[in-house]
Structures are given as structure tokens and as C-alpha cells.
């Protein structure tokens, strides 16, 4: 709340970072939230060999998704319109988790992220995908994670009718080297 208020003084909206799966190096969270799939999620978590002992049997992670939706709904009940949007990292497996007509799915996750602020915007990051694309019809803008920001700009401000956004690193690589 304080952070949002401080940003508002400068007309800067607060967008919040979250993840599609629970934090990959918090073993208690992985186990308790039942966030480890029976399929290799190494592209997302980077340590599947280490965490696969916590893997469940449901390929859609329905129990996890239900818990994750409830957590985000609770946050949004508290934060309300102070959160103007979300950037969801690690939505690399949207086809395995969200692309279903029955809940939990992409629609129910988007609803959870908009609890308290139905106008909150949403991007789901499929990783570095060229050309950039949406992974769920409930998102409002493209996550735009790129290694070469200029590559994405060649497509213009809109891709498939969706606002393009660029997220890249400063320095030599992601989290490494001088800026």
C-alpha cells in the first residue's frame, strides 16, 4: 500500500510480478502448494531433477492452481485498485495448465488476479518466444521477454491486436555483468 501510494505521487501505476508456479527453490512452498508437476518443468524451475521428488500425479496441477488462485485473490482483496496490473513469469506451460474449459484454468487465474480490481491488466510470460505471442486469451498485453530488445520492436506496438511490451536485461546478460 505504501509503495503504491509513493508511486501514485508521480503518476506511476503499480504492476506486480508473480509466477505461474510456486518459487522453485522454496521446497516447503513447492511441497505444501503441490506445485511440482509430473512432467519436466526444468524450463520454468531450472532444478527439476532436485524437486521432482515432490511431484504430484495431476498433469494439470489442479490442486496447486486452486491454492495459487486463492492466494492471489486474497492479495487482491487487500490491495484492490492499488495494483493496476500483473506480469506473470514462467507461463511456459500454459497449454498444460490453462488451456482448458473447466476450472482451474487461465480464466480462473486471471479472475483471481483481478479480484479487487477488475481493470487490472495482465501479461503472461511464455519465455523468450519469437515472434512474441499471447499464451492465454485472458491477458491484456504481451510479456515481451527478449534477449535482443530491438528484435521485438520490428513488429511495432501491437502484435495480434495486443499491446507489445519489452522486458530485457541491462548489462551483459540476465543478472550478470556490469550495467
Residue ranges of predicted features:
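Mature catalytic domains of secreted/periplasmic carbohydrate-active enzymes
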Residues: 1-179
